[in-house]
Design a protein with these regions (language model features):
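Short, low-complexity, charge-dense intrinsically disordered segments
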Residues: 1-17, 23
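Generic alpha-helical structural signal
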Residues: 18-19, 127
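Extended, alpha-helix-rich binding/interface surfaces that flank or overlap catalytic cores
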Residues: 25-148
Length: 148
């Protein structure tokens, strides 16, 4: 086999195929944006949104939607923080406002709950890995954003 061939095919011919494979691979991979938040306790947190899923049926917060964030305050150890939005809180908001929450509104309330934990809990890793958005907090958070 020559220096410019691989498996009997000139390497130049494989290059476009590899570029296509890498391009498709990158499209299929989720790109997560690392964001920063300076908490009032003096810690600077970096976090990104991992995803959301229905809470497990055995979870004390169920039925709820679990929003998962990966968080670090030292850039060495990353840990998951789950923020639960119980169905009863979303239903209470719907009853008050006459419409269901959009996905963006749910995410906004959950993210504000995460920020509140960053501000109020000194060691989020030890004491703030499971957070809940109750009906009162949901109303307060969305009102602060002007959502009605």
């Amino acid at each position: 086999m020559g220096a410019d061939e691989s498996f009997g095919i000139p390497w130049v011919r494989l290059c476009p195929l590899w570029l296509i494979i890498l391009g498709v691979h990158n499209i299929l991979m989720t790109v997560r944006r690392m964001k920063t938040y300076a908490g009032s306790q003096g810690y600077v947190y970096q976090y990104y949104f991992v995803g959301k899923r229905p809470a497990l049926a055995s979870d004390p917060e169920a039925p709820a939607t679990e929003f998962v964030f990966d968080v670090t305050s030292d850039r060495k150890l990353t840990y998951a923080v789950s923020v639960f939005l119980p169905e009863k809180a979303a239903e209470a908001w719907k009853a008050t406002h006459g419409r269901a929450l959009s996905d963006a509104e749910q995410y906004a309330a959950v993210k504000l709950r995460l920020f509140r934990a960053f501000d109020e809990i000194e060691q989020v890793r030890a004491h703030g890995r499971r957070l809940t958005v109750d009906a009162a907090w949901l109303e307060e958070a969305l009102a602060s954003l002007g959502v009605e």
